[in-house]
């Protein structure tokens, strides 16, 4: 009986790890979505984008533009003593 219980505990732990790995981030760039074989979006016909680690078709409106301007240093941090 103890061996069966231990087997099920190990099986549960292994399956939990597999679920965690499959639910994690699947992309870091838009190109990753193409390489893993995500099909074109049905509504737009465009390729999905990578948004927060997931390939997404409806996220393009929510994507924040990359800022190219740098924030000037504040006076308190730019002083040399």
Curated annotation (Swiss-Prot):
Asked if Disulfide bond is a keyword of the record, the answer is yes
One GO biological process this protein is involved in is:
defense response to fungus
Lineage summary: Eukaryota, Viridiplantae, Streptophyta, Embryophyta, Tracheophyta
| Keywords associated with the record | Antimicrobial, Disulfide bond, Fungicide, Plant defense, Secreted, Signal
Q: Name one GO cellular component term.
A: extracellular region
Q: Which family does it belong to?
A: Belongs to the DEFL family.
Q: What is its main location?
A: secreted
What cystine linkages occur within this chain? 27-50, 33-57, 41-59
Q: Which organism is it from?
A: Arabidopsis thaliana
Stretch forming the signal peptide: 1-24
Q: What is this protein called?
A: Defensin-like protein 311
Q: Which residues form a coiled coil?
A: none
């Amino acid at each position: 009986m103890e061996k069966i219980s231990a087997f099920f505990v190990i099986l549960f732990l292994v399956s939990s790890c597999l679920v965690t790995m499959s639910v994690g981030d699947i992309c870091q760039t838009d190109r990753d979505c193409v390489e893993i074989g995500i099909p074109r979006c049905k509504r737009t016909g465009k390729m999905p984008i990578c948004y927060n680690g997931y390939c997404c078709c409806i996220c393009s409106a929510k994507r924040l533009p990359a800022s190219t301007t740098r924030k000037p240093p504040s006076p308190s941090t730019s002083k040399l003593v």
